[in-house]
């Protein structure tokens, strides 16, 4: 017996009311948007840019079954540098991605001294280096050249927050799109390379 339509619909209503709503992962995270953008650039033959893996040292592995090994304990082997690197039109690209819920600034404690040093080294080798900053509460995204990030960082050794006004003055706003989602190569081509490509 199906009990159409009343008992089925009332049962559904009761279960949906009794379950708490989970708002986790409602929107795509900024990093996932960058990964989707990089996949698009790769599929179109525009750039080859990948997320850098974080090196870990495995300490203990549990083998409940021979085919089901489980890492129980692991540590970071070394401090990571930046999130992404690759090649665009013959230029080496290296960048960090940061997202904040704050409305007026991004905390500089999110940038570590070894990351700043790495960015300085990339710039010394004529690489293209920058940070993509996403203010999730305003849905604003900026590309800030590493030079401007480093300059601000060295003012007080990364102790204070970088105001949004500074980012708007020295960075470039990126409007989200469909394909690619975060078209940062447009900013690189137009502003960092002056419209030239190899």
Curated annotation (Swiss-Prot):
Q: Give binding positions for Mg(2+).
A: 81, 83, 96, 115
- Tell me the classification of the organism that encodes this protein: Bacteria, Bacillati, Bacillota, Bacilli, Lactobacillales
Reported cofactor(s): Mg(2+)
Residue stretches spanning the membrane: none
Which superkingdom?
Bacteria
- The segments labelled Disordered in the record are 1-22
Task: Name its species.
Answer: Streptococcus pneumoniae serotype 4 (strain ATCC BAA-334 / TIGR4)
Q: What is this protein called?
A: Holliday junction resolvase RecU
| Name of the coding gene | recU
Q: Which SUPFAM superfamilies match?
A: Restriction endonuclease-like
Family (UniProt): Belongs to the RecU family.
**Principal localization?**
cytoplasm
Q: How is the cofactor bound?
A: Binds 1 Mg(2+) ion per subunit.
Keyword list (alphabetical) reads:
Cytoplasm, DNA damage, DNA recombination, DNA repair, Endonuclease, Hydrolase, Magnesium, Metal-binding, Nuclease
| MF terms in GO | endonuclease activity; magnesium ion binding; nucleic acid binding
């Amino acid at each position: 017996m199906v009990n159409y339509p009343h008992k089925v619909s009332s049962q559904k209503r009761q279960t949906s009311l009794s379950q708490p709503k989970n708002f986790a992962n409602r929107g795509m995270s900024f990093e996932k948007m960058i990964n989707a953008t990089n996949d698009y650039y790769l599929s179109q033959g525009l750039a080859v840019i990948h997320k850098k893996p974080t090196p870990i040292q495995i300490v203990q592995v549990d083998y409940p079954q021979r085919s089901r090994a489980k890492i129980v304990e692991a540590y970071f082997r070394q401090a990571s540098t930046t999130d992404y690197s690759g090649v665009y039109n013959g230029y080496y690209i290296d960048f960090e991605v940061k997202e904040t819920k704050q409305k007026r600034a991004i905390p500089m404690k999110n940038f570590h001294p070894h990351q700043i040093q790495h960015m300085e080294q990339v710039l010394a080798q004529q690489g293209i280096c920058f940070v993509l900053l996403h203010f999730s509460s305003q849905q604003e995204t900026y590309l800030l050249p590493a030079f401007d990030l480093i300059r601000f960082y060295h003012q007080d050794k990364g102790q204070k927050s970088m105001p949004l006004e500074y980012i708007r003055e020295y960075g470039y706003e990126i409007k989200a799109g469909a394909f690619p989602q975060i078209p940062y190569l447009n900013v690189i081509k137009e502003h960092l390379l002056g419209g030239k490509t190899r």
